[in-house]
Curated annotation (Swiss-Prot):
InterPro entries: AB_hydrolase_1, AB_hydrolase_fold, PPase_methylesterase_euk. Keywords: Hydrolase, Serine esterase. Residues 1-72 are annotated as: Disordered. This is Protein phosphatase methylesterase 1. Demethylates proteins that have been reversibly carboxymethylated. Demethylates the phosphatase PP2A catalytic subunit.
């Protein structure tokens, strides 16, 4: 860039928010911090998140760096893995009597007292650690909150025989999530089910919506939040899935190289999130290519027969299921007609983060946590103060 162009850019956007400057996040950090402070990489504060009550056009502020060039890792920044123990109390392995060959794996921090339980389901190809950083941000705001983030079958550390690992039908995944919630309650000896907020990203959004619509968890579900997936745009995006899979690397020389690729390609735009979640996406296997032994754990191509099944009818179910509803998107262009009408009718809450990529909760964990906590508080039944019954007032001798 010429000096003239840089001068113009600074005059246009402000010297302190030059979108063409190299990123300064974690500069000089060359060791893994014991407890890294999970923050949104975006320079704007959590209070600046775009919240809309209609489907009007949103104009992002200049400091959101929407057009920043894909960058490598800044000099001095560490790429060391951050362990799951930084964010969760324990990991659990759960076996269902209905399907004992499948051993579910999940990360858990138990709720305290009457605190809520955020039950989280990741997207295709991801893992429960996708929600690690946002989980810590939720607990900063609600210290009694619990977090349950499972690894879907065929993903993460959940084990299933080969013939069952990729039974990725939507009703199977919905049953899996229900089983994990019930088995966790039994495993932890909870006397009753805590109030639940279901949270799902991408494929996970379809799963939590299906479970909410089924009503299996009864009145314990306060509401459900869906992250960056709607029926229309999801089905359209399936057309380019093969192109995406063919262009990403088949493997990486080191775990750190895999983390760096996710940051450089802006697949994940927050280095703390990438260092936490990416290691669970890869597995060491030098049989295919010793020079790139870190391979993808999940064969996304094998899930193709189920892609349309995941999303067909999603908008209708999302609007019809009982409980509070929230949709978090990276752009209003993702709304389809059915959801646009539903938004105009006030049927659900809509939050838009135009500065985020598809992995909203990883790119902007603090802002996502603020939205989820506010969503819970709006739907928290224990916070409701009901007026006294007329019969009780009469018994007390009061005039009515």
């Amino acid at each position: 860039m010429s000096d003239l162009q840089r001068t113009w850019a600074k005059a246009k956007f402000g010297a302190s928010n030059d979108p063409f400057d190299e990123p300064q996040e974690e500069q000089g950090q060359d060791v893994l911090p014991e407890l890294p402070e999970p923050v949104d990489d975006d320079s704007s504060s959590a209070s600046s998140a775009s919240s809309v009550s209609s489907t009007g056009t949103i104009i992002p502020s200049p400091n959101q760096k929407l057009f920043a060039r894909p960058q490598g890792v800044a000099r001095g920044r560490t790429l060391e893995q951050i362990p799951w123990t930084t964010y969760f109390e324990r990991e659990v392995s759960l076996k269902s009597e209905q399907d004992p060959e499948v051993i579910y794996h999940a990360y858990l921090t138990s709720p305290v007292g009457k605190g809520p339980l955020f039950v989280m389901h990741h997207g295709a190809g991801s893992s429960g650690l996708s929600f690690a950083v946002v989980a810590s941000q939720i607990r900063k705001r609600i210290s009694t909150a619990g977090i349950l983030a499972l690894d879907c079958r065929g993903h993460g550390s959940t084990y299933a025989p080969e013939d069952k690992a990729f039974d990725m039908r939507l009703d199977t995944l919905s049953s899996d999530l229900y089983n994990v919630v019930q088995l966790t309650k039994t495993e932890m000896s909870w006397p009753e089910m805590p109030p639940i907020v279901l949270v799902g990203h991408s494929l996970g959004g379809a799963v939590v919506t299906d479970l909410a619509k089924s009503g299996k968890l009864g009145t314990s579900v306060l509401g459900y939040a869906v992250l960056d997936v709607v029926e229309g745009s999801a089905i359209d995006a399936l057309q380019s899935m093969h192109t995406y899979l063919s262009t990403r690397p088949l493997g990486f020389a080191t775990l750190q190289a895999g983390i760096e690729w996710h940051i450089r390609s802006r697949t994940i735009r927050n280095s703390i999130s990438a260092r936490t979640s990416v290691p669970a996406l890869l597995v060491f296997n030098e049989n295919d290519d010793p020079t790139r032994p870190w391979r993808w754990r999940t064969n996304l191509g094998a899930t193709q027969p189920y892609w349309e099944d995941w999303f067909v009818g999603l908008s209708k179910k999302f609007l019809e299921a009982r409980g509070g509803k929230m949709l978090l998107l990276a752009g209003t262009d993702r709304l389809d007609t059915e959801l646009t009408i539903g938004q105009m009718q006030g049927k659900y809450a809509l939050q838009v983060f135009p500065e985020a990529g598809h992995f909203i909760h990883e790119d902007l964990p603090e802002k996502t946590a603020v939205s989820l906590v506010d969503f819970f508080r709006r739907n928290d039944r224990t916070a409701l103060v009901l007026p006294p019954k007329v019969s009780d007032l009469i018994k007390q001798g009061k005039r009515v």
